[in-house]
């Protein structure tokens, strides 16, 4: 009887594991199809995708020859540069060897071999723990979590191990050469398990850096900075931009400084702050405000969430007197709250209106109701108009 029970228990565990594999398997094919076929607007390469229009930055010739790349290709280029430069660098994660769900590691195993680009079991805590061990030996570990939504099983490894390793050893040991990549944010039809923006969970953890790019050019430069940084870094990649965002990207390696926000557009009346995909939303809002209200907006891409660039944001708010912050994550406890609190403390006497946060709702991320959930340009514009009329 005990043998039958044990066998039944084993079958149940196998069944549960199979269900989990099938559930997670839904991440693959569905999410790289459909909406990720953007329509080209004109020769400027502006692209309308879902709730935003991607706006490429002017081509930079500062770093030599450039090539047209989408965001996932720029990630591949950065990883290629790192593997070529650093013989200790390794890349690993679920399905990484064949190129990854979003093709960010395509061709790298063939070029650098199975000992440097390889698959892992479906176990996020194991992936990060393995990466910590590699980094502690002095090698460069580049771990991939297949979706940011599934980074939570690795939360203990990141928060209690990676982030504290240097401190608890009195700087005798560290895992600063660990970088964790993860596709992030809304995707058009990802629903509650493939759309989350969990950056705020890690913002409360001293010892790690959190970075989110808005474009292919930014992604390559920021990722290379993360890989070479002496602290563990989490690099969230807006997956809706993987194919939708296309611009000229330098072929050779280059770095963009971490913890340094970028003022994309200067203005005098309102400061707009965002990161990742949402930057393109607020850029549209800035254009709408100028056209409809005659309001001049200063647009800031935060880029690094932790440690964030307080000086750039506060300097802008002192000038404009108004601040709107927007992100896809839920409102309560979102990183906009931290920015708002800091600006309130530093710039209180300069504020002309209450700080506005335009964010996702305090609900699980919905499927068919995603268009109502996301903080689109109309929600941001309405909040901006209320600030101006305050």
From Swiss-Prot:
Organism whose genome encodes this protein: Rattus norvegicus
GO MF annotations in UniProt: 3-methyl-2-oxobutanoate dehydrogenase (2-methylpropanoyl-transferring) activity; metal ion binding; protein-containing complex binding
Modified residues (N6-acetyllysine): 230, 239
Quaternary organization: Heterotetramer of 2 alpha/BCKDHA and 2 beta chains/BCKDHB that forms the branched-chain alpha-keto acid decarboxylase (E1) component of the BCKD complex. The branched-chain alpha-ketoacid dehydrogenase is a large complex composed of three major building blocks E1, E2 and E3. It is organized around E2, a 24-meric cubic core composed of DBT, to which are associated 6 to 12 copies of E1, and approximately 6 copies of the dehydrogenase E3, a DLD dimer.
Top-rank taxon: Eukaryota
SMART domains cross-referenced by the UniProt entry: Transket_pyr
Binding annotation for K(+): 176, 178-179, 226, 229, 231
Catalytic activity: N(6)-[(R)-lipoyl]-L-lysyl-[protein] + 3-methyl-2-oxobutanoate + H(+) = N(6)-[(R)-S(8)-2-methylpropanoyldihydrolipoyl]-L-lysyl-[protein] + CO2
Transit peptide, residues from-to: 1-48
Descriptive protein name: 2-oxoisovalerate dehydrogenase subunit beta, mitochondrial
Location of the protein in the cell: Mitochondrion matrix
Keywords: Acetylation, Lipid metabolism, Metal-binding, Mitochondrion, Oxidoreductase, Potassium, Transit peptide
Cellular component terms per the entry's GO annotation: branched-chain alpha-ketoacid dehydrogenase complex; mitochondrial matrix; mitochondrion
Enzyme class: oxidoreductase
Binding residues for thiamine diphosphate: 150
Function comment: Together with BCKDHA forms the heterotetrameric E1 subunit of the mitochondrial branched-chain alpha-ketoacid dehydrogenase (BCKD) complex. The BCKD complex catalyzes the multi-step oxidative decarboxylation of alpha-ketoacids derived from the branched-chain amino-acids valine, leucine and isoleucine producing CO2 and acyl-CoA which is subsequently utilized to produce energy. The E1 subunit catalyzes the first step with the decarboxylation of the alpha-ketoacid forming an enzyme-product intermediate.
């Amino acid at each position: 009887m005990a043998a039958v029970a044990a066998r039944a228990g084993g079958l149940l565990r196998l069944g549960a594991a199979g269900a989990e594999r099938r559930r997670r398997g839904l991440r693959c094919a569905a999410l790289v199809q459909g909406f990720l076929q953007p329509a080209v607007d004109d020769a400027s390469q502006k692209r309308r995708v879902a709730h935003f229009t991607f706006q490429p930055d002017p081509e930079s010739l500062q770093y030599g020859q450039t090539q047209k790349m989408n965001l996932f290709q720029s990630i591949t280029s950065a990883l290629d540069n790192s593997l070529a430069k650093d013989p200790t660098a390794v890349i690993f994660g679920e399905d990484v060897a064949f190129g990854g769900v979003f093709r960010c590691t395509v061709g790298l195993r063939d070029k650098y071999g199975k000992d440097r680009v390889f698959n892992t079991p479906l176990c996020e805590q194991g992936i990060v723990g393995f990466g910590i061990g590699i980094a502690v030996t002095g090698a460069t570990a580049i771990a991939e979590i297949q979706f940011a939504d599934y980074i939570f099983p690795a939360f203990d490894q990141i928060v209690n191990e990676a982030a504290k390793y240097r401190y608890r050893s009195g700087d005798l040991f560290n895992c600063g050469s660990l970088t964790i990549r993860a596709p992030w944010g809304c995707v058009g039809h990802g629903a509650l398990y493939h759309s989350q923006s969990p950056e705020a969970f890690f913002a409360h953890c001293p010892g790690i850096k959190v970075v989110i790019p808005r474009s292919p050019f930014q992604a390559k430069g920021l990722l290379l900075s993360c890989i070479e940084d002496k602290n563990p870094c989490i690099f969230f990649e807006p997956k809706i931009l993987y194919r939708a965002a296309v611009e000229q990207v330098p072929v050779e390696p280059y770095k963009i400084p971490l913890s340094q926000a970028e003022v994309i557009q200067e203005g005098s009346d309102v400061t707009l702050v965002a990161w990742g995909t949402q930057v393109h939303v607020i850029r549209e809002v800035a254009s709408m405000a100028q056209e409809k209200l005659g309001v001049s907006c200063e647009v800031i891409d935060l880029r690094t969430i932790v440690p964030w660039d307080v000086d750039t944001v506060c300097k802008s708010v002192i000038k404009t007197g108004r601040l709107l912050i927007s992100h896809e994550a839920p409102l309560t406890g979102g990183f906009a709250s931290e920015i708002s609190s800091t600006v309130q403390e530093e710039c209180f006497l300069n504020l002309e209106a209450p700080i506005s946060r335009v964010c996702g709702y305090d609900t699980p991320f919905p499927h068919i109701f995603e268009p109502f959930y996301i903080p689109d340009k109309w929600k941001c514009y309405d909040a901006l108009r209320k600030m101006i009329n305050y």
